[in-house]
Amino acid sequence: MLQLSSTAKRLGASLLLLLAFLVAYGFFVQPWHMRWGATDAEIAMALPGDPFIPPTTVVSTRAITIHAPSTQVWAWLVQLGQNHGGFYSYDWLENLFLAQMHNADRIVPEWQNPQVGDEVTMMANPPPMSIAKIALLDPGRALVLKGGWAFYLQPLDAQTTRLIVRYASFPVKGSWTAALFYYPIFEPAHFIMEAGMMLGIKQRAEAAMSTPAPKPNDPLLLLAKEARP
């Protein structure tokens, strides 16, 4: 009987592990993180930025409850961008890619009046693909970037706000090369950074309501529990 070489056995075992990972990711991990913290109603909700979403993209909807007034949350939200207050996520990780990111821990008055057409940069000296322009602005309620990254505030009461983030990927559907990069690499990385950003906004907005204001914690430590409605 023909026996498989040790190399063939290792290759077969590696392929089985890869297949198991892809199945686990596709059936369990991806469905969880694509709707992290969001309710069924929020996922089905029509939002003002939806017309900006290209049909070839993959869309996620994530949400988090913030125990602060929507006006307080908005003040942090409009500071997004490397050219302003950062993204409140893992700047040390972003800076590995020369983003020169610095996350603000205070409200800066000069950044509180964004306009449609203003640029939101993702890194220092950004190439065109790392610059997003504000496509739609509803002060206090909605901030939508061209290409389909949208942020919405839904007040639950005077002191509680839902932050809903809907994100459309770069074109993926119909392109195997784009899909091979997007699903195993970009999508999980973007989730970690976006969830960290949402937790960073939550911590800063809630800290502003406390006396004395605590320093924001590492968002990753709260990743699983803080997004619950």
Model-derived segments and their meaning:
Residues M1, A44, Y90, N217-L220:
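Generic N-terminal initiation segments characterized by hydrophobic and/or small/turn-forming residues
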Residues M1-K9:
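N-terminal Lys/Arg-rich, disordered targeting/topogenic segments
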Residues A8-L15, M45-T57, T65-T71, V78-Y152, ...:
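Glycine-rich portal/gate segments that line the openings of hydrophobic small-molecule binding cavities
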Residues S14, L18-T61:
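Short acidic N-proximal helix/loop "leader" segments that mark the beginning
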Residues V29-R35, S210-A224:
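Exposed, flexible binding/inhibitory loops of compact, secreted disulfide-stabilized domains
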